[in-house]
Regions:
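AMP-binding/adenylate-forming catalytic core of the ANL superfamily
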Residues: 1-69, 78-79, 84-88, 92-96
């Protein structure tokens, strides 16, 4: 799984690992959403275990990854859609994005 934004390759797992460093993030998944100028933009779906804001997560991302890789949109959800084996259904997340 790879997001191509403005000609740059962005690996969702790299962003997910940064977001999971925050103690108030229970789980997350990152996808690419179509963007008219850049091809795709990064969207993060986050399940909170405590109070955390998009601004806090954005600041965390800016500390650990390049600016162009950070999510442009944070969606807070109660749970991530998963199949019977516990794998996140990114196709469902793309529909929600």
């Amino acid at each position: 799984d790879m997001i191509i934004s403005g000609g740059s390759n962005i690996y969702p797992r790299e962003i997910e690992e940064v977001l999971l460093k925050h103690p108030a993030v229970a789980e997350c998944s990152v996808i690419g959403r179509a963007h008219p100028e850049w091809g795709e933009e990064v969207v993060a779906f986050v399940v909170r275990r405590g109070g955390v804001t998009a601004q806090e997560l954005d600041a965390l991302c800016l500390e650990h990854i390049a600016r162009f890789k950070r999510p442009r949109d944070y969606r807070f959800v109660d749970a991530l859609p998963k199949n019977n084996y516990g794998k996140v259904l990114k196709t469902e997340l793309r529909r929600l994005a």
